C-alpha cells in the first residue's frame, strides 16, 4: 500500500484563471486538477473535455479564490489510460481514481489518485488493505456492507494485487467466498510478480481449502501465469525445489501436495491407460497419446500423468497387445526360478511365450488358481482354446 499512500499533499483543488484564453483541445495527460465549478469532468476521466464550460456558481468575491475542498472518498475504481508513442503505437497505463464528495455540496466527481491528498486517500484505503492483508473475512464483509461507501471488491494495490490475491495466499476460504459473493474476480492476474492469478497463489502457498473454494467459484484451473505456467505446473515446480526428507520442509511439502491434489481433481479424470500409441513435444511439454482401458477416446496426456513403465516401454519401442488369458507356463531359459507364460491374445492369432513381467498380474493369478484347482482334483474352468 505504500505506493497508494504516497501522493502529493493536496487537499484543495484550485480552478484556473477564468479570464485566461481558452483553446478547445483534447488532452489525455494525467494528473489534472479539477476545474470547479467552470469545467466538467467526463465520467471515465480518461479524456478531459475542455470545450464544454459550465457557468460558475456565485460564491461571492473573486472567482480566483473559489476552491473545491474534498470532504471524503466514497468509492474507487481502476482504469486504463491510453499512452501514445511517437510512432503512433498505443499502450495503456493502469491508474486508480476516487469518487470524492465535496464540502461545498458539489456533486461527487471522479478524481485521479495523484490529485488527492495522501491523508484523504489513507482514510479510505487503510481499513480495506489492513483487512485484506490479514484476510479478515469479518472486517471485509463489514466494509463491503457499509452503505455509505461503494467499495470495489477488485480494488488493486500498486502491484495490481486485489484482496482476493491476499485471501488466496493466506488460505482463508471464508474471505475468498465473501469477496466472490460481492462480485470479486476469482481469476484476475496481478500486474506485477509474474502475472499470478489467485489460484496460482493459493496452490503455490499450499492452501488446499482456498484452492478448493476458488475452483468451486469458477476459477480456471489451467489459466497461465506470466510465464505460461498453469497452477498445476507452478506447484510441480515448487515441489521439485522443496527438499524431500527434510524435517524443516516436511509440513510445507504436505501442504503443497494437498493443494496439488485439489487441482488434479479439477484437471484430470482418473482412468487406466491401456497403452501409449504416440508421443510429441520435449521436456516439460512432452505428451503421449493414450488409449484407455475402458474404451474411451484416445487423448493427449502430459508425460507426468502417464505411468513410468508405460512411458519407458513406448520410448523403448515395445508394442502392446491385449491378453485374453494365460494358458501354460514353463521355466525360463535362464533358470533361477524364473518362469515364462504362454499368453493367448485377443488381436493376435498365435499365442506367445512371455516373461512374467510382461503379463498382467490378474491373468497370472487366474492361471495359478486354475492350476491349483487341477492339482487339487477340482473342476477348474478350462482356459480359452489356443490356435495352432
UniProtKB/Swiss-Prot annotation:
**Do you know which Pfam families this protein is assigned to?**
Ank_2, Ank_5, Chromo
* InterPro entries (alphabetical): Ankyrin_rpt, Ankyrin_rpt-contain_sf, Chromo-like_dom_sf, Chromo/chromo_shadow_dom, Chromo_domain, CPSRP43_chromodomain_3
Alphabetically sorted, this entry's keywords are: ANK repeat, Chloroplast, Plastid, Repeat, Ribonucleoprotein, Signal recognition particle, Transit peptide
User: What would you give as a GO molecular function for this chain, any one?
Assistant: protein-macromolecule adaptor activity
Q: Spell out the subcellular localization from the entry.
A: Plastid, Chloroplast
Q: Where is the transit peptide?
A: 1-42
Mind naming one GO cellular-component term on file for this protein?
signal recognition particle, endoplasmic reticulum targeting
| Source organism, top-level taxon | Eukaryota
Residue ranges annotated for the Chromo domain, each copy included: 68-137, 271-332, 321-379
Residue ranges for the region (Disordered) are: 1-24, 46-66
Mention one GO biological process in which this protein takes part, according to its record. protein heterotrimerization
Q: Note the segments forming the ANK repeats.
A: 123-158, 159-188, 194-223
Q: Which PANTHER family match?
A: ANKYRIN REPEAT DOMAIN-CONTAINING PROTEIN 39-RELATED
Report the protein's function.
Component of the chloroplast signal recognition particle pathway. Targets proteins into the thylakoid membrane.
Per UniProt, subunit arrangement is: Homodimer.
Q: Report the protein name in the record.
A: Probable signal recognition particle 43 kDa protein, chloroplastic
Organism, by scientific name, is: Oryza sativa subsp. japonica
Amino acid at each position: 500500500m505504500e505506493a497508494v499512500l504516497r501522493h502529493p499533499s493536496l487537499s484543495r483543488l484550485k480552478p484556473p484563471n477564468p479570464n485566461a484564453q481558452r483553446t478547445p483541445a483534447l488532452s489525455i495527460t494525467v494528473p489534472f486538477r479539477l476545474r470547479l465549478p467552470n469545467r466538467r469532468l467526463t465520467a471515465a476521466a480518461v479524456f478531459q473535455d475542455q470545450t464544454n464550460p459550465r457557468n460558475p456558481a456565485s460564491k461571492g468575491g473573486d472567482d480566483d479564490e473559489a476552491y473545491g475542498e474534498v470532504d471524503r472518498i466514497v468509492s474507487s475504481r481502476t482504469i486504463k489510460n491510453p499512452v501514445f508513442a511517437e510512432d503512433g503505437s498505443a499502450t495503456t497505463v493502469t491508474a486508480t481514481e476516487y469518487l470524492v464528495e465535496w464540502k461545498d455540496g458539489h456533486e461527487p466527481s471522479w478524481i485521479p489518485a495523484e490529485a488527492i491528498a495522501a491523508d484523504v486517500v489513507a482514510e479510505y484505503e487503510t481499513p480495506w488493505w489492513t483487512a485484506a492483508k490479514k484476510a479478515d473475512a469479518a472486517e471485509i464483509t463489514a466494509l463491503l456492507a457499509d452503505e455509505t461507501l461503494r467499495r470495489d471488491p477488485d480494488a488493486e494495490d500498486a502491484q495490481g494485487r486485489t484482496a482476493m490475491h491476499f485471501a488466496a495466499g493466506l488460505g482463508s476460504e471464508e474471505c475468498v467466498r465473501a469477496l466472490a459473493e460481492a462480485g470479486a474476480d476469482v481469476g484476475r492476474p496481478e500486474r506485477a510478480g509474474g502475472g499470478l492469478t489467485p489460484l496460482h497463489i493459493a496452490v503455490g502457498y499450499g492452501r488446499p481449502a482456498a484452492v478448493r473454494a476458488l475452483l468451486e467459484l469458477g476459477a480456471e484451473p489451467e489459466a497461465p501465469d506470466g510465464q505460461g505456467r498453469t497452477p498445476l505446473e507452478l506447484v510441480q515446480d515448487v515441489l521439485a525445489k522443496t527438499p524431500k526428507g527434510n524435517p524443516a520442509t516436511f509440513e510445507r511439502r504436505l501442504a503443497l501436495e494437498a493443494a496439488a491434489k485439489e487441482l488434479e481433481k479439477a484437471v484430470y479424470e482418473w482412468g487406466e491407460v491401456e497403452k501409449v500409441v504416440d508421443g510429441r513435444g520435449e521436456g516439460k511439454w512432452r505428451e503421449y497419446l493414450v488409449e484407455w482401458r475402458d474404451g474411451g477416446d484416445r487423448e493427449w496426456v502430459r508425460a507426468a500423468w502417464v505411468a513410468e513403465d508405460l512411458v519407458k516401454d513406448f520410448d523403448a519401442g515395445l508394442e502392446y497387445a491385449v491378453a485374453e488369458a494365460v494358458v501354460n507356463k514353463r521355466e525360463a531359459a535362464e533358470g533361477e526360478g524364473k518362469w515364462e507364460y504362454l499368453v493367448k491374445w485377443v488381436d493376435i492369432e498365435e499365442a506367445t511365450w512371455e516373461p512374467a513381467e510382461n503379463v498382467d498380474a490378474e491373468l497370472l493369478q487366474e492361471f495359478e488358481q486354475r492350476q491349483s484347482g487341477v492339482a487339487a482334483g477340482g473342476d477348474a474352468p478350462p482356459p480359452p482354446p489356443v490356435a495352432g
